A protein has these predicted regions:
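Short, gly/Ser/Thr-rich active-site loops of penicillin-recognizing serine hydrolases
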Residues: 68-73, 165-177
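A short acidic/glycine-rich loop-to-helix N-cap element
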Residues: 153-169
């Protein structure tokens, strides 16, 4: 779906070709972010907003001050499914074994997901970089002023702790002074 937004960004896609050719391998690869699916950060924010809002996607906006929240698409997930995903995403941060446990902030409930996307042109490509992602949102934060934050940084292939952990440090600094 096209999202009207005051900034220009690349369109999200399901496939590198006009007609998706979904082999079992390509479907599995896409499930963990290594297939043809490409999602821009604005679209990713809208998807995550559905987990925070009982299944409804919020229309993205830039908040200069007192932004107005509008629903982009109602009930893209059932409230039950959205809450299950939200609780799982909270465990990614809260559980000591979670991939984003470094994001845990005392007194703040944060739901999040780490990710690293490879930019390889082929299975033998060793020169292309990676993208480190961290997508998160607060739950019942600061008098109902919840935040959804999408962070992505390029060329994280030399980060020994994974690309998303660089992003986590930056986002956590918004909560810890």
């Amino acid at each position: 779906q096209t999202i009207k937004f005051p900034l220009t960004f690349k369109k999200s896609q399901y496939s590198n070709s006009e007609k998706a050719n979904w082999s079992e391998k390509k479907l599995a690869d896409s499930g963990y972010g290594q297939g043809d699916i490409l999602v821009n950060p604005i679209h990713m924010a809208s998807i995550y907003s559905a987990f925070a809002n009982n299944g409804s996607m919020v229309k993205p906006y830039i908040e200069y001050e007192n932004g107005k929240t509008e629903i982009l698409k109602q009930d893209v997930f059932t409230a039950e499914t959205a809450n299950t995903i939200k609780n799982d995403l909270i465990q990614v941060v809260e559980n000591p074994e979670g991939t984003a446990n470094d994001m845990k902030v005392p007194g703040v409930t944060i739901a999040g997901k780490t990710g690293t996307a490879e930019l390889k042109n082929s299975s033998t490509d060793t020169q292309s970089g990676t993208l480190g992602w961290f997508d998160c949102f607060t739950v019942n934060y600061s008098n109902g002023n919840d935040m959804l934050i999408i962070g992505m940084v390029e060329n994280t292939q030399n980060n020994s702790s994974g690309g998303s952990h660089y992003v986590i440090k930056k986002i956590k600094s918004l909560f810890v002074k």
